């Protein structure tokens, strides 16, 4: 199928939606009428408080306000979700787009939109209208690709997490399969994939804490909302309507719901889950009479063959197309080859239900109503920490969990020819690790297993299938248990202090092994004298980060050097890198890593005794999604460290080309603490600022607060906004 045919099909199907059926003049008139029912109030941090007469009106205003702040990020998210990034970025993004197009098909989404519940269609219509009205009233804003948004496009990006399940498909292996003769993945690709799998990388995810009234000073439930994402991945805003909508929090750019946040009665915090809900099936493929079949039990079923076209911007700027013949079995699309078999990928694909669940939970007012929304079972990747003004707290595992035969190890490809490996429906919510109001008075998740969510009152691992968790405990999980068990009189301030507790739990295990290695080294070994000052410092260190701590710098650089020596071997041995570093590296390796760390610090900063804040920096130079960092430009010291070492307040930083300092790009991004008393009270901070425009005073106005962990008051109620309003206006009104 040619691109022209695809565009014609898209236009024909899109014409079925109300916003697309009228003329441009009629569209604009309808959009202006909607804008007249919407008010946007910008507070003194540039945060939008949007009110509409209906929920749809609020959606219109909310996405319009997002576009004002950073249209570039909105378009980038939908280029990714629709598999159209290569149209903007060129051939290098073709494989990313092909991966998405294995699941996302415009014609399918248009059909799903047409069958959606009327209330949801109204929200999607308003979403498209809001973005199109922004473009119509801001001609200086030049989209790279999407010049007109259609309502069905909202179904391509229905879940707010930074990494969808589809991203677990290896681009290298996808390229090896569809870019070369099948079953002949190159040695270079395999080597690249292995190197990427073991390299040091910042953990992604989040921290969520829910504190019951029994553990708080004032008898009100508390909720910590602390996503660890790429900086500036979400917008902070409030959306309200006369239909009962009143949600505040973090909304992923371009989506029309608050992903992590709260309303007047309840709050929700999502953390990336360790549950195994995406599976690979190794298919035995046969060729007969020029056709492909795969074995399934005693059957030989036909492989589904289709064509996918991926447009991309060629070097001359023109639009070119790559055409792929893709294959599927009933398990899913083929994404790679391994050991002489084709591997099919299975994951949740319920875009309508996922969008329903994402929006409806923002209107839940208590645990029961939140759980009712969860019965849609369209959340596959996120745990949830919940709290409400009735004093209830809860932990929910993801709701889309396929029921499987626990004899098989689903962390690896299973035999697709064996019907026993197939998914057998979904688990009931009651069959997953869930907790409500545990006696200890707190719940937490830090992207660790659910079996420490409530200390001794946690779900028991033996009661659940293996696939309910695929990671185990983590340093941040150990740290969270430590701070939450330490008191029973939490206030918003002390919960913030707990969220920024500086203890680095990973080094509590690792530094003693380094000390032992050093102490057992013979006195006549030259390394003993060379590393003596470093060991004196590390042995006396309290294992806490701070901007002035030289020990933090040395420990982090040592940890990174030892990780590089350990990760590949740990992967081969099937153990965690932390365990391998502590227990299986030799004394000589541990000391060599310390010498390397000392040399790096001295070479880059003049002395191994360099304060951590001189190295670890926050910098925002421009509004680009991928920023170029520069040691000669202003930056801010950040005291907290990587979540890799157990820091709850996570700052994922590293060196970049041309820099010696470390610059953060992920980790703490939006942080909020919410108290559910007679009136909800909240404090929050975002990385950098709300605006993506470097000329705006709200581009970096929160940066210092962010680095210091100083949260500001959230203006949730209209009376709180009094005296803090910069501007009130309706969409389309000029500045």
Descriptions of predicted regions:
Residues 2-20:
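Gram-negative bacterial Sec-dependent N-terminal signal peptides
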Residues 24-234, 242-244, 249-257, 262, ...:
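Substrate-recognition/specificity elements adjacent to catalytic centers across diverse enzyme folds
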Residues 58-61, 107-122, 355-361, 463-471, ...:
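Second-shell loop/turn segments in exported
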Residues 105, 109, 120-123, 127-130, ...:
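Stable alpha-helical elements in mature extracytoplasmic
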Residues 244-255, 261-266, 270-414:
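Glycine- and hydrophobic-rich flexible loops that cap the catalytic core of alpha/beta enzyme folds
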Residues 247-249, 379-487:
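Hydrophobic alpha-helical segments
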Residues 457-462, 466-527, 616-735:
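Terminal end segments
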Residues 556-635:
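Charged, long alpha-helical assembly modules
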């Amino acid at each position: 199928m040619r691109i022209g045919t695809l565009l014609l099909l898209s236009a024909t199907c899109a014409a079925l939606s109300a916003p697309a059926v009228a003329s441009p003049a009629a569209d604009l008139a309808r959009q202006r009428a909607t804008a007249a029912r919407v008010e946007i109030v910008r507070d003194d941090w540039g945060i939008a408080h949007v009110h509409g007469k209906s929920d749809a009106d609020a959606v219109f205003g909310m996405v319009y306000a997002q576009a004002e702040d950073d249209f570039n990020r909105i378009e980038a998210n939908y280029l990714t979700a629709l598999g159209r990034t290569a149209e903007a970025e060129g051939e290098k993004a073709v494989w990313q787009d092909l991966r998405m197009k294995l699941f996302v098909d415009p014609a399918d989404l248009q059909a799903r939109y047409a069958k959606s519940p009327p209330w949801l269609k109204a929200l999607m219509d308003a979403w498209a209208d809001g973005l199109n009205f922004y473009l119509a009233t801001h001609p200086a804003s030049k989209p790279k690709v999407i010049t007109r948004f259609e309502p069905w496009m909202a179904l391509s990006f229905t879940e707010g997490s930074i990494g969808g399940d589809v991203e677990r498909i290896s681009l290298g292996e996808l390229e090896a399969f569809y870019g070369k003769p099948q079953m002949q993945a190159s040695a270079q690709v395999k080597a690249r994939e292995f190197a990427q799998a073991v390299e040091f990388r910042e953990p992604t995810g989040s921290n969520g804490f829910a504190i019951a009234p029994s553990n708080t000073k004032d008898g009100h439930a508390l909720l910590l909302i602390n996503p660890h994402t790429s900086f500036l991945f979400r917008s902070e805003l409030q959306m309200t309507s006369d239909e009962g909508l009143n949600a505040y929090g973090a909304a992923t750019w371009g989506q029309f719901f608050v992903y992590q946040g709260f309303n007047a009665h309840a709050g929700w915090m999502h953390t990336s889950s360790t549950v195994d809900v995406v599976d690979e099936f190794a298919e035995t493929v046969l060729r007969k009479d020029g056709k492909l079949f795969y074995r399934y039990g005693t059957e030989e079923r036909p492989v589904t063959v289709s064509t996918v076209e991926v447009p991309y911007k060629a070097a001359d700027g023109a639009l070119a197309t790559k055409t792929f013949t893709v294959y599927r079995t009933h398990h899913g699309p083929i994404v790679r080859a391994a050991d002489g078999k084709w591997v099919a990928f299975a994951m949740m694909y319920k875009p309508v239900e996922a969008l329903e669940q994402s929006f409806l939970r923002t209107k839940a007012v208590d645990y029961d109503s939140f759980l009712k929304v969860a019965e849609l079972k369209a959340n596959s990747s996120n745990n949830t920490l919940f709290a409400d003004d009735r004093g209830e707290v809860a932990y929910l595992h993801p709701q889309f969990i396929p029921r499987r035969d626990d004899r098989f190890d689903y962390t690896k490809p299973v035999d697709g020819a064996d019907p026993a490996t197939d998914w057998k429906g979904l688990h009931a919510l009651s069959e997953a690790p869930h907790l409500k109001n545990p006696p200890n008075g707190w719940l937490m998740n830090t992207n660790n297993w659910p079996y420490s969510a409530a200390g001794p009152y946690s779900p028991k691992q033996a009661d659940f299938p293996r696939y309910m968790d695929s990671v185990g405990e983590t340093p941040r999980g150990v740290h969270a248990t430590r701070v939450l068990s330490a008191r029973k009189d939490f206030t918003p301030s002390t919960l913030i202090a707990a969220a920024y507790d500086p203890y680095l739990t990973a080094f509590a295990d690792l530094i003693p092994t380094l000390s032992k290695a050093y102490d057992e080294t013979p006195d006549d070994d030259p390394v003993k004298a060379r590393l003596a000052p470093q060991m004196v410092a590390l042995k006396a260190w309290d294992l806490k980060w701070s901007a002035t701590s030289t020990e933090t710098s040395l420990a982090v650089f040592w940890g990174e050097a030892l990780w590089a020596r350990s990760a590949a071997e740990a992967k081969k041995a099937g153990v965690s890198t932390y365990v391998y570093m502590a227990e299986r590296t030799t004394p000589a390796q541990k000391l060599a890593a310390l010498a390397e760390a000392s040399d790096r610090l001295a070479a880059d900063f003049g002395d191994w005794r360099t304060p951590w804040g001189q190295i670890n920096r926050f910098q925002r130079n421009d509004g680009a999604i991928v920023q170029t960092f520069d040691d000669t430009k202003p930056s801010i010291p950040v005291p907290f460290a990587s979540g890799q070492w157990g820091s709850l307040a996570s700052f994922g930083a590293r060196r970049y080309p041309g820099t010696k300092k470390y610059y953060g790009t992920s980790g703490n991004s939006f942080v909020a603490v919410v108290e559910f008393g007679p009136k909800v009270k909240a404090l929050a901070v975002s990385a950098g600022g709300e605006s993506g425009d470097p000329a705006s005073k709200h581009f970096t106005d929160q940066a210092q607060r962010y680095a210091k962990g100083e949260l500001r008051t959230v203006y949730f109620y209209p009376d709180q906004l009094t005296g803090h309003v910069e501007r009130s206006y309706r969409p389309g009104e000029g500045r």
